[in-house]
Amino acid sequence: MAAKDVKFGNDARVKMLKGVNVLADAVKVTLGPKGRNVILDKSFGAPTITKDGVSVAREIELEDKFENMGAQMVKEVASKANDAAGDGTTTATVLAQAIVNEGLKAVAAGMNPMDLKRGIDKAVSAVVSELKNLSKPCETSKEIEQVGTISANSDSIVGQLISQAMEKVGKEGVITVEDGTGLEDELDVVEGMQFDRGYLSPYFINKPETATVELDNPYLLLVDKKISNIRELLPVLEGVAKAGKPLLIIAEDVEGEALATLVVNTMRGIVKVAAVKAPGFGDRRKAMLQDIAILTAGTVISEEIGMELEKATLEDLGQAKRVVINKDNTTIIDGIGDEAQIKGRVAQIRQQIEESTSDYDKEKLQERVAKLAGGVAVIKVGAATEVEMKEKKDRVDDALHATRAAVEEGIVAGGGVALVRAAAKVAASLKGDNEEQNVGIKLALRAMEAPLRQIVTNAGEEASVVASAVKNGEGNFGYNAGTEQYGDMIEMGILDPTKVTRSALQFAASVAGLMITTECMVTDLPKDDKADLGAAGMGGMGGMGGMM
């Protein structure tokens, strides 16, 4: 086991604080409408330019192991805030730095760290409750647009796109962010259920000008196995031909003579057919086939439940108003499924989202909800260079998470004002069990001014003057650093999602409280590589002596 380096008391805390400040100072320059960018060097490729707090935090690793421990703990604050609300990472870092600095001053003055932490926890709990009281619902498109604009670093086009996307696909719909091909940002909305499987043969194409297959009022045959024998399909094909409607086959695969016969029948015009592979893999494939069945009022032909393809009838087939297939995607528009059954299926998937612990599974389940509930919107980010594209994509992603958080828990006045107001409201009535807890309460409430002060500092103004003016105001009165004007923050469109502000404060206080109560730090002693190299060199010289 490697030897350890151990530091105690003030020695440990000074080192830890240095690490906290290095990381927080790098992150906090990005805060607010006039926040600056940070350039991150990469081991390969061009450097990344970002204004996203968590991206900056993740890149920082310090040489001194004790300082690095402090930095890593603040990195955890930014990371947790990002996981919970998708935004507010810089605010969380600034709050953590302020609480740690104030708290360690009190510890150095001889206060009991445990009582300080209890005081901080009381203050945070009271302020979180007050934030809920100050919060107002975020319902109108205008408010959604304002939240998106602020979070995308005052980029109003991004705010508009997110607002339009939410209008089109609903607040629960899936909105994804992709690289665009031009200089402008674009919004692409796919209505109906789309999945990433294209036609199995180009001979199915009936619209050569767009290289797509379009089927009007088709039947849908859903099968959870491979089809290679055409005999299994004959009864269904005959029934569909009599009905005079087209047929879409969605199966694990269609191959061999079955695919060849379908192509020949289509080309001769005997029956209009197209075939695609079922989306997903394994259990997810079965679940998605079931989703399509509910959407189109069909049945999945599965041997697991004792159904055979040869015995399938028209009653087992789903129906939709229209299906469009290209080489990569299949879109089912207006399935005839029962509304109540679709809602029941959506509720069931939502329950699975609640119970799931994997982010990947949650994302896939959320996509299934959106496909059942009405559509998917894609924001295509345009930029002149790849470096700008990455930076912009980060901002659009943040804005998207912020608007979702706003819809979920409502909005409060932005620009750091909500925390200042909530802190002022609870300050008079909040008391600890002893004097040291009172000091903890006061330092936590004082630290809640830090985001406002940092926004003002980044805008090149005097933080103390603005903070004093904002504290003397009432309600949503605050300072718009973008226009350098005082006024009602909500009327000026400076909004923050309540969830983002709340998460930032809770995670910052949680980690900062632990750091204040630290008395000892243990790390591995650095290996003395020079000594090892010296020994190796001496051995080599000895060998040369022998040769002479």
UniProtKB/Swiss-Prot annotation:
Annotated localization: Cytoplasm
Keyword match Isomerase: yes
Catalyzed reactions: ATP + H2O + a folded polypeptide = ADP + phosphate + an unfolded polypeptide
Annotated positions binding ATP: 30-33, 51, 87-91, 415, 496
Pfam families per the UniProt record, alphabetical: Cpn60_TCP1 (PF00118)
InterPro entries recorded: Chaperonin_Cpn60_CS, Cpn60/GroEL, Cpn60/GroEL/TCP-1, GroEL-like_apical_dom_sf, GROEL-like_equatorial_sf, TCP-1-like_intermed_sf
Domain of life: Bacteria
Gene3D superfamilies tied to this protein: GroEL, GroEL-like equatorial domain, TCP-1-like chaperonin intermediate domain
Keywords of the record: ATP-binding, Chaperone, Cytoplasm, Isomerase, Nucleotide-binding
Primary location: cytoplasm
Enzyme class: isomerase
GO molecular function, one term: isomerase activity
E.C. no: 5.6.1.7
Family in the record: Belongs to the chaperonin (HSP60) family.
Biological function: Together with its co-chaperonin GroES, plays an essential role in assisting protein folding. The GroEL-GroES system forms a nano-cage that allows encapsulation of the non-native substrate proteins and provides a physical environment optimized to promote and accelerate protein folding.
Assembly: Forms a cylinder of 14 subunits composed of two heptameric rings stacked back-to-back. Interacts with the co-chaperonin GroES.
Annotated protein name in UniProt: Chaperonin GroEL
Provenance organism: Haemophilus influenzae (strain PittGG)
Lineage: Bacteria, Pseudomonadati, Pseudomonadota, Gammaproteobacteria, Pasteurellales
Gene: groEL
